[in-house]
């Protein structure tokens, strides 16, 4: 029973709950970035470059069995080794956008923290200073 109580204390700590919330929000945010990359940015890049779909860019590394269409999905299903560089380009762009957004968020938080420096310590009241002087003078007497 002590194990369950220890686990409950561990799980209810603030850091664990904050981490769980961060993971959930991060997963949802990752889906937004995926959509941004796949639905908005990559179509623009493919329009400029002239390719319609980056995810289907690949190099076939071996002969395909007879009758297998030469599409990435069909070749993978047939077990043909392929070098799928188009998917890598999409994932790399996705990562760069996500990293840039996280950088902007951390930068904004850092600026907010730096903008509010800690308050200077309050001056010691005069009566406390006097009491300290008396204490120090009593310590010095033989």
From Swiss-Prot:
Keywords: Cell inner membrane, Cell membrane, Ion channel, Ion transport, Membrane, Transmembrane, Transmembrane helix, Transport. One of its GO terms (molecular function) is mechanosensitive monoatomic ion channel activity. InterPro entries: Mechanosensitive_channel_CS, MS_channel, MSC/AndL, MscL_channel. It is a multi-pass membrane protein. It is found in: Cell inner membrane. Signal peptide: none annotated. One of its GO terms (cellular component) is plasma membrane. The chain crosses the membrane at residues 16-36, 86-106. Homopentamer. Belongs to the MscL family. Channel that opens in response to stretch forces in the membrane lipid bilayer. May participate in the regulation of osmotic pressure changes within the cell. This is Large-conductance mechanosensitive channel.
């Amino acid at each position: 029973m002590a194990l369950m109580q220890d686990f409950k204390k561990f799980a209810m700590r603030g850091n664990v709950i904050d981490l769980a919330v961060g993971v959930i929000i991060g997963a949802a945010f990752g889906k937004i970035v995926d959509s941004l990359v796949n639905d908005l940015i990559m179509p623009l890049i493919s329009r400029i470059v002239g390719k319609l779909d980056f995810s289907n860019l690949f190099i076939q590394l071996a002969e395909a069995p007879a009758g297998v269409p030469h599409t990435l999905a069909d070749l993978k299903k047939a077990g043909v080794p392929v070098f799928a560089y188009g998917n890598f380009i999409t994932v790399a762009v996705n990562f760069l956008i996500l990293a840039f957004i996280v950088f902007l968020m951390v930068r904004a938080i850092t600026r907010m923290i730096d903008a509010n420096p800690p308050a200077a310590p309050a001056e010691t009241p005069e009566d406390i200073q006097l009491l300290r002087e008396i204490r120090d003078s009593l310590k010095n007497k033989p």
